[in-house]
Curated annotation (Swiss-Prot):
GO BP terms in the entry: electron transport chain
Alphabetical UniProt keywords: Cell membrane, Membrane, Translocase, Transmembrane, Transmembrane helix
One Gene Ontology cellular component: plasma membrane
Principal subcellular localization: membrane
Recorded superkingdom: Bacteria
Self-association state and partner proteins as the record states: Associates with subunits I, II and III to form cytochrome c oxidase.
Catalyses which reaction(s): 4 Fe(II)-[cytochrome c] + O2 + 8 H(+)(in) = 4 Fe(III)-[cytochrome c] + 2 H2O + 4 H(+)(out)
Signal peptide segment: none
Subcellular location(s) of the protein: Cell membrane
Stored InterPro entries: Cyt_c_oxidase_su4_actinobac (IPR021050)
Protein name: Probable cytochrome c oxidase polypeptide 4
Function of the molecule: Part of cytochrome c oxidase, its function is unknown.
Gene for this chain: ctaF
Species, as recorded: Mycobacterium tuberculosis (strain ATCC 25618 / H37Rv)
Parts of the chain that traverse the membrane: 10-30, 36-56, 78-98, 101-121
Amino acid sequence: MHIEARLFEFVAAFFVVTAVLYGVLTSMFATGGVEWAGTTALALTGGMALIVATFFRFVARRLDSRPEDYEGAEISDGAGELGFFSPHSWWPIMVALSGSVAAVGIALWLPWLIAAGVAFILASAAGLVFEYYVGPEKH
């Protein structure tokens, strides 16, 4: 997780420096002064990247080092089982379609379509999470 933390720290620094430069340059060359929408968006993007970097730093302290954290690591060092993967599941497609329905409802401001999209998102997310769950009474 050290590599991921360092990556997001560089991204955060880039966006903060970009926000400062953008604010200074728009105040110097724009007719209306500082363009606050872009400056605020860049600053908030840098802040969000810093939040993610901080989270990865805290996680990296609690976990053991991974092969990705070593400079001289080989691809074979990370070999092994990574976890369960369901290649034939339809639920991710249903979650994406449900999110699309909700996004179209928001874009067109149709409250009934927003409600339907949110309901579909909840149902499809539950289907995704509980796809392989078999209750104690079913054997």
